[in-house]
Amino acid sequence: MREGMTVYIPPQATLARVRTKKLMYMAVFLIILSVLLWIGSFWALYGRQTIAPALSYVALLVLSFVTDRAGYSVLPINSTILTGWLCMTLVVMISSVLQSEPVRRQTRGMTYIMGGGITGLALGLLGFTFLTDLSALYACMILATVAGIFLGFLLYTNTPDGRPIRPGSGNFFRYLLAKGFPTAITLMQLGVALVLVIALYNINGI
């Protein structure tokens, strides 16, 4: 190419590059926003438990708008998934509002409950090592999360602080539902995103 000559770039190519960059920046922004919302939902479980599932749902909703350079959704978070988890979120929020104020503000045992739930979620995601059906993977993640929350709370009731709500005290299941239900829904919505991410990674890796 001779010096001084200019290269003609068609307007369509320039517009395509600008659009691609915008999509990339928007995808990064939405992913960061989604992560921050999930962090906020975990924080809310300790003091503002009523809004924790809502923050987790919004994080999942935001993630559904993430697209690749071609404009296609990165994760197949469809309207069926969003509608189902919206209903679950509304149910758990209403049940939390119906709890007495002292119970809603109580943080007793939340470290054990959340620790058990996160551990169960992580173990449930390991179902990819022996399961291939997506529905079975969802079920594995959900059951493992519920089991983790239950075992975490059961472990807490064996500590000196947890003895007043130990099994047989009359408060065990009531407190477990009051704290475990919002925690489960909050973690499971994160689990839905992680299941889809791992499933796509496995498909692309074949």
Residue ranges and their predicted role:
Residues 168-185:
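Individual transmembrane alpha-helices with interfacial aromatic-anchor signatures
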Residues 37-45, 93-105, 157-158:
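C-terminal ends of transmembrane helices
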Residues 87-129:
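Helix-adjacent hinge/juxtasegments
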Residues 35-57, 65-67, 122-134:
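Transmembrane alpha-helix interface/packing and boundary motifs in multi-pass membrane proteins
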Residues 24-31, 76-90, 139-141:
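Structural signature of hydrophobic alpha-helical transmembrane segments
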Residues 191-206:
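Juxtamembrane boundary at the C-terminal end of a transmembrane helix
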Residues 11, 15-44, 116-122:
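Small-residue-enriched transmembrane helix starts and helix-helix packing motifs
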Residues 49-56, 85, 131-155:
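Selective recognition of hydrophobic, aromatic-rich stretches within alpha-helical transmembrane segments
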